[in-house]
Amino acid sequence: MLATDLMIPAVADVRGTTITYYDSRDEKDRDDVLVMIHGTSGSTKAHFGFLFPILAAKQRVVSIDWTQPAPNGKPIELDQLVDQVAGAIEEILPGRKAFLLGYSLGAVVTAAVAARRPDLVERLVLVAGWMKTDLQQILRNDVWQALRASGDGAIRAYSTFCAFGGPFLASKTLADLQPGMDAMAFDAFGDQQMELNRRINIVEDVHRISAPTLVIGCTHDQMVPIRHQKALFGAIEDARFAEIPTGHAVVFERPSELTHHIQRFLDEPEAFTAGSIVPTPQP
């Protein structure tokens, strides 16, 4: 089956808000359903174009796209995105728990869902997430905001520089990266998410997470440095930690390695006990 056959959008009504989601539907004779939440300015197609069809080959996969919860120019709140995800799970998977995965800002949202709605979450994967925004992140955000306000095309180069790891960029040419830079889309909802990123603080939530959790950090991440994922690992009682040698854009740099860690946690949740460091897969 082609990826395009799986990634067909559907809609759910969540307390009067229309939420777009993608559902592979075939449960592959498994009880667990993987629910994925994208990151800042992303979508299912933008962030999970590789992961969705590969993971859907072994179990049912649902991926939820946020709906803009406030008018252009108005701030959005984390609680609004958390409510969208929790409500969508209740609507799409009534009476069931999800294997919940979040990437980047999606990891912040899913961590909060797991803390506040443990009845909805069986297990949790947090990819390149964080608990509390620090000064390094705010300074990077300041530069992004200035470039966005100026309309300078340099925002595409800056976003690429920040998203990918140094070793990955050093192995490419500008011509290799130009199509992706040209395809970047900027809109009001993305601007709202970038502003929200400045105000993240889920420290109290994270300490309440009870679901078995896999935290995945990225060695060369400049957007959410790996110390943040290590802090999540330390704060969640039933957590194990895996590290992938990429920048923040792990879903593009090493999607196969990322998929390996996710699938193993699905297939063998007891393979690594709480507090374990998951080894790098060997060829």
Where are these regions (language model features)?
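Conserved HGGG/HGGXW glycine-rich cap/lid loop of the alpha/beta-hydrolase fold
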Residues: 13-71
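Short alpha-helix in the alpha/beta-hydrolase fold that links the catalytic acid
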Residues: 49, 211, 225-234
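Active-site loop/oxyanion-hole signature of alpha/beta-hydrolase fold enzymes
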Residues: 49, 62-99
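Flexible "cap/lid" loop of the alpha/beta hydrolase fold
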Residues: 111, 115, 123-151
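Conserved alpha/beta-hydrolase catalytic His-Asp/Glu region
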Residues: 135-137, 153-205
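Short beta-strand/loop motif that positions the catalytic acidic residue
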Residues: 209, 215-217, 221
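Acidic catalytic loop of the alpha/beta-hydrolase fold
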Residues: 219-224, 249
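Catalytic histidine-centered segment of alpha/beta-hydrolase-like enzymes
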Residues: 246-260
